[in-house]
Structures are given as C-alpha cells and as structure tokens.
C-alpha cells in the first residue's frame, strides 16, 4: 500500500461517519492535515479538512492542481476512468479482539 499523501491522491476515510468512502486530496494544510473532497455528488464525502491519521492512501492518483474545485476533480476522475471506483465503498478494517487479548 502506498504511504504517500499528495495532491490528487485517492484516499479512503477510515474513521468517522464517512468511514469506507473514497475521496481525493485537493490541498495539504500542514504535516498533520489535508483537505479532501469526494466530491459529495459522487462518493458522499464533502470538502473538508481531515487529519492524515483518519485516511488511508490508495495506489490511484489523478492529475489536478492544488485547491482544485469539485467540478475539476470530477472531470479528472472521469478522464481517468475512476468514477465507478469512487462510488464503491470499502469496509474499514477493524481490530480483531480475541479472548486472550482481554485481561
């Protein structure tokens, strides 16, 4: 799995109410936060600032400029053929707790 988070990278939200939904990084705020968008009309993720610990990067990337609008992101996703991929939800990996783990 790719561990690079850069503008245009497709990511999966792993925490919060949008867990399992895919989004695209449109801006990097600092070393801890990025701005992502679904766009909401496509994957259900609205444009927002998120902690990088709450997302998991994928190996997919689209060509967009920093701060691209939702319309520009949607056009880039269509050009890359990733529209159906973005609509699919991913089941977040949950920790498996065994009886030996409980003390």
Swiss-Prot record:
Entry protein name: Large ribosomal subunit protein eL14
PANTHER family: 60S RIBOSOMAL PROTEIN L14, LARGE RIBOSOMAL SUBUNIT PROTEIN EL14
Entry keyword rRNA processing: no
Presence of the UniProt keyword Repeat in the record: no
Family of the protein in this entry: Belongs to the eukaryotic ribosomal protein eL14 family.
Superkingdom of origin organism: Archaea
Encoding gene, per UniProt annotation: rpl14e
GO (cellular component) term, any one: cytosolic large ribosomal subunit
């Amino acid at each position: 799995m790719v561990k690079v988070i850069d503008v245009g990278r497709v990511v999966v939200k792993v925490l919060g109410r949008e867990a399992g939904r895919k989004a695209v990084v449109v801006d990097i705020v600092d070393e801890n936060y990025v701005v992502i968008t679904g766009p909401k009309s496509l994957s259900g993720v609205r444009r927002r600032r998120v902690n990088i610990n709450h997302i998991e990067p994928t190996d997919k990337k689209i060509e967009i400029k920093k701060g691209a609008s939702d319309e520009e992101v949607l056009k880039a996703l269509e050009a890359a053929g990733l529209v159906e991929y973005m609509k699919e939800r991913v089941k977040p990996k949950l920790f498996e707790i065994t009886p030996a783990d409980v003390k």
